[in-house]
Amino acid sequence: MSAIVDIIGREILDSRGNPTVECDVLLESGTMGRAAVPSGASTGSREAIELRDGETGRYGGKGVLKAVEHINTEISEAIMGLDASEQAFLDKTLLELDGTDNKSRLGANAMLAVSMAVAKAAAEEAGLPLYRYFGGSGAMQLPVPMMNIVNGGAHANNSLDIQEFMIVPVSQPTFREALRCGAEVFHALKKILSDRGMSTAVGDEGGFAPNFGSNDECLSTILQAIEKAGYRAGEDVLLALDCAASEFYHDGKYQLAGEGLQLSSTEFADYLANLADKFPIVSIEDGMHESDWAGWKTLTDKLGKKVQLVGDDLFVTNTRILKEGIEKGIANSILIKINQIGTLTETFAAIEMAKRAGYTAVISHRSGETEDSTIADIAVGLNAGQIKTGSLSRSDRISKYNQLLRIEEDLGDIASYPGKSAFYNLR
């Protein structure tokens, strides 16, 4: 039995300099698991609640000492002595201890830190790499990365309304080669921006944040960077968008301030369809407001057979909401953010539900990250096929890519890279 003998919670800083929660779990054998949780900038209203202190005189109210105290007191008391290898039972214990629908009492940040740290300790105890502990012998597929090379919206201080413009390397035989492709396109884009006298400062997720005049101009420039790096747009590298449309939906209209447009749901669906016709876009995330289900249905009917339509704020990694979306034919993919739901067991349930319904699942970071690379192991362990973890700069993003390189090396000849087949529900 891998009995838990000690739990230590602490307050650390994330990549934005804001406090977040880290947890150490020590087992009877002396093995330890350590995990740190991320935090988002654009958040869905139905996400599990991360507990913040609210003391304005300390970290602007963003401290997490209350969440840490919960770990070091009642969570510690509840799980002390439990078997770390019984993840589902441990997560159930946390859920019952919290007792709320949205984890608002203990805080999803406290609960997730413990859930992840326990899994890491159990994997160490079993002598298994984390991805293998999660997925068993069937874990051998590396994920296709969506690399956020231009930031807009809530992630950058510029005039772009769409939050993320991503490149998706798909023709490469290995993850290592896909990562190289992404890095080369990133540096080609930097040179193009520099030559134009545009900003090469980066946003929260490591992508550039220049002031383009329109989304079209931004996408056209990315195509130039792909070609400059020696790759073929639409063949070697595809494009993906995260609209984060909930951020610019006001008074029943999609208000693209950067382009001076105010669009209805149908008009915005047409706007996105036009972009998908002009550019090799394979995936669009949060293309409608999280509560605009009629708009989502319109978008899905219009684009759902040829473009991956990812629900992030829409589904918030929640199986109850995902089930409703599947039944209504809304979107065709779910973004998986572990801190949106707050335990590993619930995260894995969302991935499995999506797969059973023929939806894809994209494992994702948050804009406020740490050096913790657990999501890389989840992507491989659960055979998700896709990961979204930022640009080719900032060590908080690169830590996940580097972990995937290590996993691919560890897998050796049995490692596979799915490329375009990761988008298995498109025609």
Curated annotation (Swiss-Prot):
Similarity field: Belongs to the enolase family.
This protein's record includes keyword Lyase: yes
Role, per record: Catalyzes the reversible conversion of 2-phosphoglycerate (2-PG) into phosphoenolpyruvate (PEP). It is essential for the degradation of carbohydrates via glycolysis.
Protein name: Enolase
Location in or out of the cell: Cytoplasm; Secreted; Cell surface
Binding site for (2R)-2-phosphoglycerate: 163, 337, 366-367, 388
Substrates-to-products reaction catalysed: (2R)-2-phosphoglycerate = phosphoenolpyruvate + H2O
UniProt pathway annotation: Carbohydrate degradation; glycolysis; pyruvate from D-glyceraldehyde 3-phosphate: step 4/5
